[in-house]
From Swiss-Prot:
Keyword entries, A-Z: ATP-binding, Cytoplasm, DNA damage, DNA repair, DNA replication, DNA-binding, Nucleotide-binding, SOS response
Binding site residues for ATP: G30, N31, N32, G33, S34, G35, K36, T37
GO biological process, one term: double-strand break repair
Main subcellular location: cytoplasm
Residues annotated as transmembrane: none
Gene3D superfamilies for the chain: P-loop containing nucleotide triphosphate hydrolases (3.40.50.300), RecF/RecN/SMC, N-terminal domain (1.20.1050.90)
Subcellular location: Cytoplasm
Gene: recF
Keyword NADP (UniProt): no
GO cellular component: cytoplasm
Protein name: DNA replication and repair protein RecF
Species, as recorded: Pasteurella multocida (strain Pm70)
Record family assignment: Belongs to the RecF family.
Length: 358
């Protein structure tokens, strides 16, 4: 998958941008605040329907403009698509694929599998379980056709159950929710466990390359006691859940944990080591998608040189070259990118929201 052309209107300081990209490496060079991250953010938004910088769309739309528009030409093998997303200041979104209305953000996300590597991305390792569940669920979204619907229904049922807990005086009032909830919880947890196990060899192999001095291990935790029946657990924990006001145990509490030499990685690794591990995880997941589905991810890398020495930057660059993926990389100077100079690439200078090829 690759973006061949991108048009941007009124997205932060990018008021009018029309760019053609290389299917390999694309370098974005410019000072802090010039618009490099905004371009990566626009690409990410097109593939996710949300920003990785802000949850408030009005902060993304250019000042005094009613909306922003993102439009791209994308290619995968012999197939081509034209995709567009318009976000109104009132909050509404319009998604078009090949000129047709009525599409959803999930349709865009399926067309544009992306991996994001940013300095803030360390939350995957030192943040809460929600970030690691999202990591697993991203993979399942692209591997299992039925996962997204199951995930949506699971979250809907949990919200309904939590609302019912506020009014319930006895467990029987929740049985209507729990019969379906238990089925979906087992299905989603089984998919997550299978995916985590399938991904584990890829992660361990990539970690040996990036962090050979450490023994990295991974483990999946489903969100409730491993040997407990989830239906029985919901009955037994009714009074506790009712007192707290929400469902404490279940797939919404699942986690995917990482250890280095037997200890939690967030406790023992430096920031540089954490970034390398995060890069290894993103690369492993992208390579797993390629092996299983023959689909390339698009890699978005913000502030390439941050936290990495020259040798590690060269190592990451070589692994990205081998992946065959389209890659977008931002840096302050071209010197920071000298380890990443494949034959096929394009460099753009970014200055105060203006982007021009060099």
């Amino acid at each position: 998958m690759a973006i061949s052309r991108l048009l941007i209107e009124n997205f932060r300081n990018l008021t009018a941008v029309d760019l053609e990209f290389d299917h390999g490496f694309n370098f974005l060079v410019g000072n802090n605040g010039s618009g490099k991250t905004s371009l990566l953010e626009a690409i990410f938004y097109l593939g996710h329907g949300r920003s990785f910088k802000s949850a408030v769309s009005n902060r993304i739309i250019s000042y005094e403009q009613p909306h922003f528009i993102l439009h791209a030409k994308i290619q995968e093998q012999a197939h081509q698509w034209s995709v567009g997303l318009q976000k109104l200041r009132q909050g509404n979104s319009v998604v078009k694929i090949n000129g047709e209305d009525g599409n959803k953000i999930a349709d865009l996300a399926h067309l544009l599998p992306m991996q994001l590597i940013t300095p803030e991305g360390l939350t995957l390792l030192n943040g809460g379980p929600v970030y690691r569940r999202a990591f697993l669920d991203w993979g399942l979204f692209h591997h299992h056709n039925h996962f997204h619907l199951a995930w949506v229904n699971l979250n809907r049922l949990l919200k309904q159950r939590n609302a019912a807990l506020q009014q319930a005086t006895h467990y029987q009032a929740l049985e209507i929710w729990d019969r379906e909830l238990v089925k979906l919880a087992h299905q989603v947890s089984e998919w997550r466990a299978q995916y985590a196990e399938a991904l584990r060899p890829e992660i361990e192999q990539t970690c040996r390359l990036f962090l050979p001095e450490l023994e990295i291990s991974v483990s999946f935790h489903q969100g409730w006691e491993k040997d407990s029946d989830y239906a029985d657990l919901l009955v037994r924990h009714f009074e506790r859940d009712r007192a707290i006001g929400y469902t404490v145990s279940g797939p919404q509490k699942a986690d995917f944990r990482f250890k280095a030499n037997g200890l939690p990685v967030e406790d023992v690794l430096s920031r540089g080591q954490l970034k390398l591990l995060m890069c290894a995880l993103r690369l492993a997941q992208g390579e797993h998608l390629m092996k299983q589905k023959e689909r390339h991810c698009i890699f978005l890398i913000d502030d390439f040189a941050s936290e990495l020495d020259q040798y590690k930057r060269a190592l990451l660059a070589e692994r990205l070259k081998q992946s065959g993926s389209q890659v977008f990389v931002s840096a302050i100077t071209e010197t920071q990118l000298k380890q990443m100079q494949p034959q096929q690439h394009r460099t753009f200078r970014v200055e105060e929201g203006c982007i021009a090829p060099l």
